[in-house]
């Protein structure tokens, strides 16, 4: 006998497409930007960055919240995630194209958590992804799902200025991978 699953398949697709995705965005070199800017230029540069980020986020039909002077939280649905992957997280290039001073350009790191069973775990994976992006030199997007990391961007040369931080970040990421693994050899 046959079982009609069309409606159940459609509901599954709708459910998967509407799953939440969390992204934490961070301006990597915020302090350097502020030092390079004249007082009169700072708010204009930050407004330009905010405008570029908001325009990019609008494609995801989600919400972009500025949580700190150089941190943003972006929440959107899974159905828009592939758009950002297809465009290779073009916001990295868009933000980097803003010129603040000679040889000073803002860079952005993005940590994304997806495919998590709960919102707190989604946020935790986004934070872990951001830490991984920063440990790899910043200026890139890192996506963490339940299994592994995916990396996008990272075209600028990494500057090694946080060796203790990098060691801690890598240790935390390594610990998370071991904790999530079923078997470790």
What role is predicted for each listed range?
Residues 17-79:
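Catalytic NTP-binding/metal-coordinating core of nucleotidyl cyclase/transferase enzymes
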Residues 21, 107-109, 182-184:
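Residues that mark the start of a beta-strand
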Residues 50-61, 82-106, 118, 123-132:
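Alpha-helical scaffold within the catalytic cores of cyclic-nucleotide enzymes
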Residues 63-75, 100-128, 138-147:
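A short glycine-enriched loop-to-beta-strand structural element that forms part of the catalytic core
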